[in-house]
Amino acid sequence: MPLLPVALISSMLYFQMVIMAGTVMLAYYFEYTDTFTVNVQGFFCHDSAYRKPYPGPEDSSAVPPVLLYSLAAGVPVLVIIVGETAVFCLQLATRDFENQEKTILTGDCCYINPLVRRTVRFLGIYAFGLFATDIFVNAGQVVTGNLAPHFLALCKPNYTALGCQQYTQFISGEEACTGNPDLIMRARKTFPSKEAALSVYAATYLTMYITSTIKAKGTRLAKPVLCLGLMCLAFLTGLNRVAEYRNHWSDVIAGFLVGISIAVFLVVCVVNNFKGRQPENGHIHRDNVARMPMTNIPRVESPLEKVTSLQNHVTAFAEVT
């Protein structure tokens, strides 16, 4: 049972909580404040790429934000808690103590159960990635200021005052629009698609968790069906954004790339594909192997050494006799 100092555990926990709090605060500032100014992108007169009808507020969408955020936050929590509990109980029932993580003792009173440690670690990394995905998406939207397909329906530009006699005339500046400023600002933040990024991040993280953790017999078809179902829901979320004229294809594809990249990075590089800690014997074996020489050259005894050794034996025999 490994013993870890209380001060070390406390400092590591405090440092991770500071990072998590900073990530949440940055996501909050991106989402609910005007701290970061959106880039004002111009457009051509009567541009067909931005002349789609206004689909209505986000709450009227087939995948409203409340439903998307609830599923992205609730389903992974439920799946990971149930999965870790099932794996832990199965290891206890089969007495598979070799593959089970050890209980960590911190100080003289605190015991960290492997079930609690793995669950908190996987859920904490998932929450961090969820906020990181939101930050990446918001940063891209603020920097690019890409216009929504229904932008002109909200902008309501006065083409006569702007002198739009030709379709090739470029219009720039916020004063070109006469519509609702809040709706116009929201229509300038579409690249990459936040809904596509969050949905595919949750689906990818859960898919990799299910394929790496659940290894019971009889799940050869259950795992692919469940994983493909999750990825299909994320894919349909992106298609719905395009079908409702809320995002362009490029917005959705960029959102998919952001979500998948963050999920794969966290799973592979941070939680090590949801594997447990390696036993200490493995580290000792690697240390011994590291100290071994690259080549083993046999020692050749010279004739002079043989003569000297023979003289020593003769002298020792003479002293004894």
From Swiss-Prot:
GO annotation, cellular component aspect: plasma membrane
Protein name in the entry: Phospholipid phosphatase-related protein type 5
Top-level taxon in the UniProt lineage: Eukaryota
Keywords annotated in UniProt: Cell membrane, Membrane, Transmembrane, Transmembrane helix
Protein's GO biological process: phospholipid metabolic process; positive regulation of filopodium assembly; positive regulation of neuron projection development
Database matches in Gene3D superfamilies: Phosphatidic acid phosphatase type 2/haloperoxidase
Functional note: Induces filopodia formation and promotes neurite growth in a CDC42-independent manner; impedes neurite growth inhibitory-mediated axonal retraction.
Localisation per UniProt entry: Cell membrane
Residues spanning the membrane: 6-26, 62-82, 122-142, 196-213, 225-245, 252-272
Family from the record: Belongs to the PA-phosphatase related phosphoesterase family.
PANTHER family assigned to the protein according to its UniProt record, in alphabetical order: LIPID PHOSPHATE PHOSPHATASE (PTHR10165), PHOSPHOLIPID PHOSPHATASE-RELATED PROTEIN TYPE 5 (PTHR10165:SF17)
InterPro entries: P_Acid_Pase_2/haloperoxi_sf, P_Acid_Pase_2/haloperoxidase, PA_PP_rel
Residue runs in coiled coils: none
Organism of this sequence: Mus musculus
